[in-house]
């Protein structure tokens, strides 16, 4: 049996289900390209039949990604498989992933069928998917609670029908490692054709055991692990990719297994997903948390000064985190900035050097020193600015009366190429800025979530504001970064307004298409 573990990333499918607002096609593509740099073997990027937006994003990613296999999900229904095959047809290499529930509670309560009927549906779905590709994965949903006799029957039948990967999900995160390992071992002992497929696992974290269950599974013969960046996903989340990758790398001598993951891309990819998904990483998160390589105890610090491996089983550099952040000033030349971006893993194709350097100089004049995390934040802001924005914030001036609590904000904003200036008051500077922007744009949205964070540490940190807003019964997520919290809030609002503007254009286009169809049918 091979010692190579296939890494199947489902951040853009299972992970996205946890988000308050869906990612845009451009944001999904950014993450997909980061996953490709990271070296994932397979990336599951959506559920094409679920919506036109999901279909478009799967197709766009399938057209772009070259080095990873692109996968789409489908139920055990022909219409789902057709949609997945159509969206994936432009890919260099693709996989169709079809699934059906197999546990007694799901079969009887959700599907309202007999197990034999469900088995027949599964076989039919796999055979149908094989018409489009040889690479078909079949999942036994809620396998962790499926009677073992039924699970063995289902796995054998799916392999016989043509599935080349069989996924065993612990859908509700119910099993413990010894129990889950026994399930995998039993399949290897009792399914006669199991050597004709790769056994995969997909563990959820409801009891905090997703990573432990996945490691136990590969010790018993599984050779694919399904996971997400930062462990994001429904409810308590999924198995964390970065934890799996670093466990297998750090304990290779004991486990004897390896992956194709480029570990130096882990930190960068984690940051990107956290930023775009508006899901901060907890400080004590293994591998990528802010405190993962922090040593506060005097005894620990003394040991670290004598020998790093006294208290570090891996280095921050191994995941692409530079231990010694080089501070830069307004006197730093373009070559310094380019060099630092390269050291952090960014190629010149990932950002606009002219725009980045211009923003760097502005920030350096304000802060004095600029750090690595600042550059990453500026590159993210610059990428946002390159989008086709109807609204662009030019200037924000705020005056606040600390005794009365009333603030006045004046904004200059470009609206479709026209400069508008408006002023408004509010209950505090952020409220005043929001009111002024709403007046200038003549667009009202309802903010349902406002989160204030920091990019960096100490007094030199950049303010990061994440907002979720409702517009026409849809949720939109905006991010703003600036040295000033009020400006960051204003930028986040403008970001959301641009997203709603694009949504209006899409709605108008769909309405126009519908009218054309109706006229054509008369």
Swiss-Prot record:
Catalytic reactions on record: 3-methyl-2-oxobutanoate + acetyl-CoA + H2O = (2S)-2-isopropylmalate + CoA + H(+)
Pfam family, one: HCS_D2
Location of the region described as Regulatory domain in the Swiss-Prot/TrEMBL record: 392-522
Residues engaged in binding Mn(2+): 14, 202, 204, 238
Domain of life: Bacteria
Required cofactor(s): Mn(2+)
One Gene Ontology term from the biological process aspect of the record: L-leucine biosynthetic process
Keyword Metal-binding appears in the UniProt entry: yes
Keyword Cytoplasm: yes
Predominant localisation class: cytoplasm
Keywords per UniProt: Amino-acid biosynthesis, Branched-chain amino acid biosynthesis, Cytoplasm, Leucine biosynthesis, Manganese, Metal-binding, Transferase
PANTHER family tied to this protein: 2-ISOPROPYLMALATE SYNTHASE 1, CHLOROPLASTIC-RELATED, HOMOCITRATE SYNTHASE-RELATED
Recorded family membership: Belongs to the alpha-IPM synthase/homocitrate synthase family. LeuA type 1 subfamily.
Cited function: Catalyzes the condensation of the acetyl group of acetyl-CoA with 3-methyl-2-oxobutanoate (2-ketoisovalerate) to form 3-carboxy-3-hydroxy-4-methylpentanoate (2-isopropylmalate).
Matching NCBIfam families: leuA_bact (TIGR00973), PRK00915.1-1 (NF002084), PRK00915.1-3 (NF002086)
Name of this protein: 2-isopropylmalate synthase
Organism whose genome encodes this protein: Shewanella baltica (strain OS185)
């Amino acid at each position: 049996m091979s010692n190579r573990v296939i890494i199947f990333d489902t951040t853009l499918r299972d992970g996205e289900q946890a988000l308050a607002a869906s990612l845009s096609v451009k944001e999904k593509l950014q993450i997909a390209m980061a996953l490709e740099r990271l070296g994932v073997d397979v990336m599951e990027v959506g559920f094409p039949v679920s919506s036109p937006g999901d279909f478009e994003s799967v197709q766009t990613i399938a057209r772009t990604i070259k080095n990873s296999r692109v996968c789409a999900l489908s139920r055990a229904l022909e219409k789902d498989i057709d949609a997945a095959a159509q969206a994936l047809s432009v890919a260099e290499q693709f996989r169709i992933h079809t699934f059906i529930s197999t546990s007694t509670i799901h079969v009887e309560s959700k599907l309202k069928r007999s197990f034999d009927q469900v088995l027949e549906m599964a076989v039919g779905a796999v055979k149908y998917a094989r018409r489009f590709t040889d690479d078909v994965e079949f999942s036994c949903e809620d396998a962790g609670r499926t009677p073992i006799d039924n699970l063995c029957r289902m796995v054998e039948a799916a392999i016989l029908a043509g599935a080349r990967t069989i996924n065993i999900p612990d859908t509700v995160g119910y099993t413990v490692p010894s129990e889950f390992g026994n399930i995998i071992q039993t399949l290897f002992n009792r399914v006669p054709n199991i050597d004709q497929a790769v056994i995969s696992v997909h563990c959820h974290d409801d009891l905090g055991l997703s990573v432990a269950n996945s490691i136990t599974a590969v010790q018993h013969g599984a050779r694919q692990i399904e996971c997400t960046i930062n462990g994001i996903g429904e409810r308590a989340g999924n198995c964390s990719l970065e934890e799996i990758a670093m466990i297998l790398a750090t304990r290779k001598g004991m486990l004897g297994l390896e992956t194709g993951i480029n570990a130096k891309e882990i930190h960068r990819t984690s940051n990107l997903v956290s930023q775009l998904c508006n899901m901060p990483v907890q400080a004590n998160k293994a591998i990528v948390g802010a405190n993962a390589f922090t040593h506060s105890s005097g005894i620990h610090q003394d040991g670290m000064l004598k020998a790093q491996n006294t208290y570090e089983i891996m280095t921050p550099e191994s995941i692409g985190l530079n231990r010694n952040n080089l501070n830069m000033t307004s006197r730093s030349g373009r070559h310094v900035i380019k060099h630092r971006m390269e050291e952090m893993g960014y190629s010149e194709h990932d950002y606009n050097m002219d725009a980045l350097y211009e923003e760097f100089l502005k920030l350096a004049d304000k802060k004095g020193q600029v750090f690595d995390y600042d550059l990453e934040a500026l590159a993210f802001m610059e990428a946002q600015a390159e989008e086709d924005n109807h609204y662009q914030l030019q200037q924000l001036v705020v005056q606040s009366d600390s005794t009365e609590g009333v603030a006045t904000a004046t904004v200059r904003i470009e609206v479709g190429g026209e400069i508008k200036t408006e002023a408004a008051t509010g209950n505090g500077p952020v409220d005043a800025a929001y009111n002024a922007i709403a007046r200038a744009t003549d667009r009202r949205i309802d903010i349902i979530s406002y989160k204030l964070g920091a990019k960096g540490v100490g007094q030199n940190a950049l303010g990061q504001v994440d907002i979720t807003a409702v517009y026409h019964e849809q949720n939109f997520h905006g991010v703003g970064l600036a040295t000033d919290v009020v400006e960051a809030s204003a930028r986040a609002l403008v970001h959301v307004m641009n997203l709603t503007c694009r949504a209006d254009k899409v709605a108008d286009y769909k309405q126009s298409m519908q009218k054309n169809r109706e006229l054509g049918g008369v």
